[in-house]
């Protein structure tokens, strides 16, 4: 099978600048005026996980026995998952990212796995929880995403829950004005990404990951087919950078 374009892009970040690839804040690249230090990078993970965990527990995080993290990167959140869950399986398509994560996430409760970005290298019904942030927004297509959710359903135990961060449009219960602003933001983001990607073909500009947006109908149409129920879409602001983060949460029936 031909390697996914998103895999190739992510592997470049793993080779060139793992921390900035995960958290692309202004001037935080390794050659920037204020590059990430390991201390600051992993403290960011601690702050964000507190916000994520609060909303996951409010939804109904079913167990702290085991968790699959999809797209662990350099281990920003993995480090915190290891303090909460008894067993953590962290997967990523980049061997370089995993090598970096292993250096800084040394808990014996964590197992790292290199994945294809298509299949999850775990047995059926082997984890109680699944978490992912800033990963599904970079997948190639909705068909790839659909297959990945099918894989999540396969490895997730019954009554297990997932919390997945991804960009969503056509919000079900937001005002017309909010929907219009969100649609404009989406269009501008798509145009900017396309322009930057075109410049890269001529050796200009900085690398940029592709962006995939999810129509809200996708979850309500596809998830029940995969055995998920209690579907909830939530957006909240994280304290680390005051940015809104949309998540979809669901339970394996």
Per-region residue spans from a language model:
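A short glycine-rich, Lys/Arg-flanked "PGG" loop and its adjoining helix->strand segment in the class I
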Residues: 146-158
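A short SAM/SAH-binding and catalytic strip from SAM-dependent methyltransferases
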Residues: 129-143
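Flexible, active-site-proximal loop/turn residues at the rims of small-molecule/cofactor binding pockets
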Residues: 136, 140, 148, 168, ...
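Conserved acidic residues
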Residues: 65, 86, 128
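Class I (Rossmann-like) S-adenosyl-L-methionine-dependent methyltransferase catalytic domain
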Residues: 1-60, 67, 74-81, 85, ...
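A short acidic, Gly/Pro-enriched loop at the edge of an enzyme's catalytic core
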Residues: 118-130
